[in-house]
Curated annotation (Swiss-Prot):
Residues 1-23 form the signal peptide. Glycans are attached at N130, N140, N209. GO terms for cellular component: cytoplasm; endoplasmic reticulum; endoplasmic reticulum lumen; nucleus. PANTHER family: ARGININE DEMETHYLASE AND LYSYL-HYDROXYLASE JMJD, JMJC DOMAIN-CONTAINING PROTEIN 8. N-glycosylated. This is JmjC domain-containing protein 8. One of its GO terms (biological process) is regulation of pyruvate kinase activity. It is found in: Endoplasmic reticulum lumen; Cytoplasm. Pfam families: Cupin_8 (PF13621). The keyword Repeat does not apply. One of its GO terms (molecular function) is cis-regulatory region sequence-specific DNA binding. Residues 131-264 form the JmjC domain.
Length: 264
């Protein structure tokens, strides 16, 4: 079975996964639980566990993505991001949801608990991105300060930029289709997130209102090897760096908790 077909077939099981607290260590989000999307073995993004700042600037910062391992310890932040703790601390706080399409024009405000308990479910593969609500970005840093102050961002900055956080939680099979912006990092706290990346000069073939899941089903299988993106699955505790203006799309293989650090 082709890689994309295998991912989609295994995703289908996610739609019948039962709610629950999950095994110890999953924070109650059930990553890797029954029906989670299988992790595709193909990875064309380099992983580095011993990267120095000089190497980062010379080899990656302006050139290509890289996956960073072991540079920070966010175990405290991870513990605070368990399902029960987030609901206890922020359940009644209003959060702003965006549509999971390229431009994300439409916004919806509702209590965080309502999002987690009623909207956080596996992606319907027939839904359009502009019909799918997604909690990512638009964070209220005043109301959520007690959480964000415990996060340790990647230590490598870029001259003339300042970091800005964007925190999110999304269901299995969800994601954002191809788009680009400035450089940044994305760390998975719980779950797994698959990334697809193209350099600025190589515009991918995609529809801005179709989901990444639809792109994986309809477009990815027909791509010749020379037209395939860089891709890899980022697991809990790993950080992906993407350079300025690189096209990227994401697919959450589990219900995933994640945080990005944009360098603006």
């Amino acid at each position: 079975m082709a890689p994309a077909s295998r991912l989609l077939a295994l995703w289908a099981l996610a739609a019948v996964a039962l709610p629950g607290s999950g095994a110890e260590g999953d924070g109650g989000w059930r990553p890797g639980g029954p029906g989670a999307v299988a992790e595709e073995e193909r990875c064309t993004v380099e992983r580095r566990a011993d990267l120095t700042y000089a190497e980062f600037v010379q080899q990656y910062a302006f050139v290509r993505p890289v996956i960073l391992q072991g540079l920070t310890d966010n175990s405290r932040f991870r513990a605070l991001c368990s399902r029960d703790r987030l609901l206890a601390s922020f359940g009644d706080r209003v959060v702003r949801l965006s549509t999971a399409n390229t431009y994300s024009y439409h916004k919806v405000d509702l209590p965080f608990q309502e999002y987690v308990e009623q909207l956080l479910h596996p992606q319907d593969p027939t839904s359009l991105g502009n019909d799918t609500l997604y909690f990512f970005g638009d964070n209220n840093f005043t109301e959520w300060a007690s959480l964000f102050r415990h996060y340790s961002p990647p230590p490598f900055g870029l001259l003339g930029t300042a970091p800005a956080y964007s925190f999110g939680i999304a269901g299995a099979g969800s994601g954002v289709p191809f788009h680009w912006h400035g450089p940044g990092y994305s760390e998975v706290i719980y779950g797994r997130k698959r990334w697809f990346l193209y350099p600025p000069e190589k515009t991918p073939e995609f529809h801005p209102n179709k989901t990444t899941l639809a792109w994986l089903r309809d477009t990815y299988p027909a791509l010749p090897p020379s037209a395939r993106p860089l891709e890899c699955t980022i697991r809990a505790g790993e950080v992906l760096y993407f350079p300025d203006r690189w096209w990227h799309a994401t697919l959450n293989l589990d219900t995933s908790v994640f945080i990005s650090t944009f360098l603006g």
